[in-house]
Amino acid sequence: QEFKGDDQTLLQFPWESKMKCSLEDIRNEQWPDMTPFVEGSVSECPDGIEKELTVQYWFEKNDVENHPDANRYFKPKAGLRKMLEIPEGDTNKKSYKRIHRWRYSPTVAYGNNEVHLHPYKARRLSVAEAMSLQSLPKEFSLPPEMTLTDCFKTIGNGVPFLMAKGVAATLKDYINTAVLNEEAGK
């Protein structure tokens, strides 16, 4: 497969070769609507959605309840009453978005008043939960001496782990193909 022309520009780089789902397919799923916030509520994954894309899947996969960073979250000083009124899945605001357990997460980009609320707990997300939404392995933790602000800034500045892994694998394949083509005199 030829990836560059005579002028050495990329013609057909296989960006999507490691993608598991297309954005179009994800957007076409029948994701649940907003539901009233009920602290401690339990619900089953709805039929017809990719569970592996959901917030709850990543919370469970990373065992966020038992993670070293499980109890590292900002405690609400004011605004708890307002926080309790925000429905699960209301992510249309600039700040204080209550993510839905059975939807994919909005972009994890903390800072500039971007705040994600836990789907079924009366609090903001923990460091462990935010890292799980970036698809980081559950063994990953941040140094305990890091401030909460720095933890969330670090998480928000990161590229999702699985995305980075896919890009790296695609680049590796591309380089290996280019080397093989070079060695074969193509």
Identify the role of each PLM range:
Residues 1-186:
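C-terminal target-recognition/interaction regions appended to catalytic cores
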